[in-house]
């Protein structure tokens, strides 16, 4: 018999609807829905009215780390549904002007260092990407998806074999407007 003890509880704000089925947590607010799978043998989630309780079967550093991570992820889900996440990136070039556009679920970077073939970066999840002048704005309700999309864009402009202190062309994250 496992002795489950409450490790942490998260209060759900008014207007949010939470459902836990098995190991999947689904949170809805204002017509938007986000869900995430939380599966672990030592930690489980229990819905109790307007709170989500994180119960743990052990009290060691590994389990405490999982509890803290899950609490942070649930709080980020609530914050994402309420306010959203928006990152801002800057297009930086010295000689060859880059053309950045969004086509479907990819960001296309043309004329990077005068290259003939365009570079692409994947847009993850329900993230929206807009390009205005020399700025790229990434917005969405999932912090993980927004951050991963920004990383994909920044990684697609890496120049291999050159000193990055000298060749500073690329698209760089300048603001996490959370």
From Swiss-Prot:
Sorted keywords for this record are: Ribonucleoprotein, Ribosomal protein, RNA-binding, rRNA-binding
Q: Which GO terms describe its biological process?
A: cytoplasmic translation
Q: Which Pfam families match?
A: Ribosomal_L6
Q: Known InterPro entries for this protein?
A: Ribosomal_uL6-like, Ribosomal_uL6-like_a/b-dom_sf, Ribosomal_uL6_a/b-dom, Ribosomal_uL6_arc
What Gene Ontology molecular-function terms does this entry list?
rRNA binding; structural constituent of ribosome
Question: What is the stated purpose of this protein?
Answer: This protein binds to the 23S rRNA, and is important in its secondary structure. It is located near the subunit interface in the base of the L7/L12 stalk, and near the tRNA binding site of the peptidyltransferase center.
Binding partners and assembly: Part of the 50S ribosomal subunit.
Q: What is this protein called?
A: Large ribosomal subunit protein uL6
Gene of this entry: rpl6
């Amino acid at each position: 018999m496992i002795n489950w003890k409450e490790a942490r509880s998260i209060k759900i704000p008014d207007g949010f609807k939470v459902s836990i089925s098995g190991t999947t947590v689904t949170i809805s607010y204002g017509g938007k829905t986000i869900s995430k799978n939380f599966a672990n043998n030592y930690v489980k989630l229990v819905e109790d009215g307007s709170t989500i309780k994180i119960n743990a079967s052990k009290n060691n550093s590994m389990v405490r780390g999982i509890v803290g991570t899950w609490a942070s992820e649930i709080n980020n889900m609530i914050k994402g549904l309420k306010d959203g996440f928006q990152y801002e990136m800057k297009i930086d070039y010295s000689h060859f002007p880059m053309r950045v556009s969004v086509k479907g679920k990819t960001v296309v970077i043309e004329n990077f260092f005068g290259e003939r073939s365009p570079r692409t970066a994947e847009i993850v999840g329900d993230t929206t990407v807009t390009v205005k002048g020399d700025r790229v704005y990434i917005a969405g309700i999932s912090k993980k998806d927004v951050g991963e999309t920004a990383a994909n864009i920044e990684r697609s402009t890496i120049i291999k074999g050159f000193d990055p202190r000298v060749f500073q062309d690329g698209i760089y994250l300048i603001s996490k407007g959370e």
